[in-house]
Amino acid sequence: MKKNGLFFLILLFSSGLLAQDWRTNWDDAKSEAEKGNKKLILVFSGSDWCIPCIKLEKEIWINSTFNEYAKDNYVLFRADFPKRKKNKPDNVTQKRNAMLAADYNPKGYFPFVVIMDSQGNIRGFLGYEKTSPKDYIIQINQF
């Protein structure tokens, strides 16, 4: 029993170490990208209904290879549009996400990844495709 509890705690804490550090304030994310001369990655996601979004999360965003590279090179921001009431963000976040969608994803594609330079200029777009985290990094860096 003690071994199971210890294993659970190790698993819980180690999974948190692999989780990407997604910014929650858009203005802070833009400022951090500029100050750190990092690419700004804006991700439009439907985390509880969009199957390609869920695959992108599992295959790329939470992968340790991607995370190790991203922490020094990217500032990540997610605008999530869940459908289930229990997953919906607060009203302020919903309004902010809607404004971001109007500016950067007016056609409403999901998942939709906007790659910007450190000054906030759009350099390219990606979506989901079955690829490795290493190849996804290469695609991002081509912009």
Positions of predicted regions on the chain:
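Non-catalytic, surface beta->alpha helical segment in thiol-disulfide oxidoreductase systems
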Residues: 103, 107-143
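Thiol-based oxidoreductase modules, predominantly thioredoxin-like and allied folds used
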Residues: 22-23, 67-95
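Hydrophobic beta-strand anchors of alpha/beta hydrolase catalytic cores
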Residues: 41-42, 76, 113
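Short active-site neighborhood of thiol/selenol oxidoreductases, capturing the structured segment around
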Residues: 36-50
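Typically the conserved alpha-helix immediately C-terminal to a functionally engaged Cys/Sec
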Residues: 54-69
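Bacterial Sec-dependent N-terminal signal peptides
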Residues: 1-21
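A short beta-strand-turn-helix
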Residues: 24-40, 70
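The canonical Cys-X-X-Cys-His
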Residues: 50-53, 113
